[in-house]
Amino acid sequence: MKILVTGGAGYIGSHTVRALLGAGHSVVVLDNLSSGHAQALPEGVPLVKADLLDQAAVQEALSVHQPDAVVHFAALIEVGESMSQPGRYYRNNVVGSLNLLTAIAQTRKIPIVFSSTAALYGDAEVSPIPEDAPKQPTSVYGETKLMTEQMIQAFERAHGIRSIRLRYFNVCGAVPDGSIGEDHVNKTHLIELALLTALGQREKMMIYGDDYPTRDGTCIRDYIHVLDLAQAHVLAVEALAQGAGSSAYNVGLGHGFTVREVLDAVDAVIEGSDYAPLTRELAPRRAGDPPSLVADSSSIQQSLGWKPEYVDLQGIIQTAWEWHRTHPHGFQD
Ligand SMILES: NC(=O)c1ccc[n+]([C@@H]2O[C@H](COP(=O)([O-])OP(=O)(O)OC[C@H]3O[C@@H](n4cnc5c(N)ncnc54)[C@H](O)[C@@H]3O)[C@@H](O)[C@H]2O)c1
Ligand SMILES: O=c1ccn([C@@H]2O[C@H](COP(=O)(O)OP(=O)(O)O[C@H]3O[C@H](CO)[C@@H](O)[C@H](O)[C@H]3O)[C@@H](O)[C@H]2O)c(=O)[nH]1
């Protein structure tokens, strides 16, 4: 199959592009490079440098490349920033997705795999969280993803566009050979920041709040390796190609770690090297952060046969460390 990957030059997108190629598919990437890196793409993968807000450019990409399916990653992704810049988030994530859906509806009505998020669930009352838990996002970012899921379903009802919406929990890690990895323009993710702090690029790690109702007072998240997530996309695209109906699946490991436990795991990974343990400082809560997000992923395991290979947090962090240690300035190195 030929797959159009929006946001394919980004962190998860570039790992998924490799996984799709590895599964024998061909790929075209559409990305405005606002936070992605052309260097993250394997040689020979066509890159359409375009913005989803440019409806005509999106339509043209679909007409020229005639893909069989779309995997839609392109979005702004920061929970905290979405609270202070809501307009940017609604415009980029909701209007951008609307443009893509409109273009699909006007051309080939191909199926779509969408990057959704655990942030849909907000302050979840059950843990691990099943897909039918109430959707009550605590951030604008989460709202933009919920709105996009709703638009996708409306476009299915009106135009027959099938979808698999993958609700990722916290994505981390890198290909074990350290050749590509996480290099977000604004660094906000816990593990990326901790490893850059270990490399001496930041003085200390801030812990955003220790008064949450969790075992040590810091937020709990479910950390999933980017390669396991990439494999979920391959399975989803292939299922849709074989005629699968639309669904939404959580993608996570099913157990969560507190912020302090993650920082301990980072210290354990760097222990014995020339790098000092992390200096930690308590800071106020970050707006929009729910206390705990842990996935019930049994549905994707049963329906698509997905099975995560990276189940040990230190092992996952080790792969990210390999990338950051060998590329301390990301794709600039
Ligand atoms: N990283 C996580 O932990 C996580 C968790 C849940 C969901 N997600 C979702 O996964 C997707 C990918 O996240 P990521 O961590 O790889 O982020 P990323 O910033 O590395 O990738 C996003 C890509 O989309 C591109 N992009 C953004 N807006 C665009 C637009 N208007 N037009 C064209 N291209 C545009 C960027 O240049 C970038 O290459 C996002 O949709 C995000 O919401 C990420
Ligand atoms: O320097 C830091 C950075 C983060 N945190 C905390 O660590 C946890 C994880 O934060 P982060 O790595 O920024 O991820 P999330 O805010 O949980 O969001 C990620 O995970 C979501 C799914 O759960 C995705 O939807 C988002 O796109 C993605 O950014 C949160 O409790 C943060 O408050 C700190 O304490 N200090």
Task: Write out the residue ranges for each language-model feature.
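N-terminal Rossmann-like NAD(P)+-binding domain of SDR-like oxidoreductases, especially those catalyzing
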Residues: M1-A174
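Short capping/connector residues at structural and topological boundaries
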Residues: P46, S84, R88, E125-V126, ...
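Residue-level signature of the cytosolic catalytic core of signaling kinases
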Residues: A50, D54, D183-K187, H255, ...
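Short-chain dehydrogenase/reductase
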Residues: Y90, T138-L146, I180, H184-E192, ...
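Oxidoreductase cofactor-interface core, primarily capturing Rossmann-like NAD(P)-dependent enzymes
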Residues: I161, D177, M205-I207
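Short acidic, glycine/proline-rich loop/turn micro-motifs
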Residues: P176-S179, T218-C219
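C-terminal substrate-binding subdomain of Rossmann-fold SDR/epimerase-dehydratase oxidoreductases
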Residues: I191-L193, L199-D333
